[in-house]
Regions:
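Acidic, Mg2+-coordinating catalytic module of metal-dependent nucleases/exonucleases
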Residues: 162-188
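Mg2+-dependent endonuclease catalytic cores in nucleic-acid-processing enzymes, primarily RNase H-like
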Residues: 2-156, 190-191
C-alpha cells in the first residue's frame, strides 16, 4: 500500500494475505484510509476484484463514506484523445491504463531528476517526492525498475506481463503497482492499496 498526499508518497507498506484473508486486508486498507481521511484506489482485477464490494460494506457498517475507485490495469487509457506526444494520442500510444500509468510515473521521475540534478524549472504536478521516512524505498526502486517496456501486438507501448517477469525469476512488483496506482488517480490526500 502507498499513502500519498499530492506529489508526496508519505507511507509505503506491504503485507501478505492468503485468499481466505482478503477481508482482513480490506479492513486494514479501509482503516488506514479512515485514519488519514483518504480515498482508496484498488486493483479491481484478479484477487482485488472483491475489494469494491468490501469497501462498500465497510462504509455501510461504519457510517463513514470513504471514496474508493477500482484501477483496471487492462482497461482503456485515460484521456484517450489527448496527445501524449506531438502527432500521437494516448489511445494510439499506450496499450492500456497500466502502460499509460507506468509511463506517467517514469516521466514524473525524469522530471524530478531534471529538477533536482539539473536545476530545471518544473511544474509541481509533474514531479514525485518520496518521504525519507517511508519503509520499503529500496524495494520500491527495485520493483519500479524490474518490468521491461514492451510492444503489444497492436504496436502500442505495454508493460511486461507478470507471467513474463516470473519466467525471468522476478516476483510480482506489488509495492510498485500500488505506487503506480497512487499517482494515477491522485488529486489530494489519498491512500491507494
Amino acid at each position: 500500500t502507498v499513502l500519498t498526499h499530492g506529489i508526496m508518497a508519505i507511507d509505503i507498506n506491504e503485507w501478505r494475505a492468503k485468499e481466505n484473508e482478503l477481508e482482513d486486508s480490506h479492513k486494514k486498507a479501509y482503516n488506514i484510509a479512515t485514519k488519514n481521511n483518504a480515498s482508496i484506489s484498488y486493483d479491481c482485477i484478479g484477487v482485488g476484484a472483491s475489494a469494491g464490494g468490501a469497501f462498500k460494506r465497510l462504509n455501510s457498517q461504519s457510517g463513514i463514506n470513504i471514496k474508493f475507485k477500482g484501477f483496471d490495469a487492462g482497461g482503456s487509457v485515460n484521456n484517450p484523445n489527448s496527445y501524449y506526444e506531438p502527432q500521437r494520442k494516448n489511445k494510439d500510444h499506450f496499450e492500456n491504463l497500466k502502460s499509460q500509468s507506468w509511463q506517467s510515473v517514469a516521466d514524473r521521475c525524469k522530471e524530478t531528476y531534471n529538477a533536482v540534478i539539473h536545476n530545471k524549472e518544473y511544474d509541481e504536478d509533474n514531479i514525485i517526492s518520496i518521504s525519507s521516512d517511508c519503509k520499503y524505498i529500496d524495494q520500491l526502486i527495485i520493483e519500479l525498475s524490474s518490468p521491461k517496456k514492451d510492444i503489444s501486438k497492436r504496436g502500442l507501448i505495454k508493460v511486461e506481463s507478470k507471467d513474463d517477469m516470473k519466467k525471468r525469476g522476478i516476483p510480482s512488483p506489488n509495492i510498485a503497482d500500488a505506487f503506480i496506482m497512487s499517482y494515477t488517480h491522485n488529486k489530494s490526500s489519498s491512500f491507494f492499496g
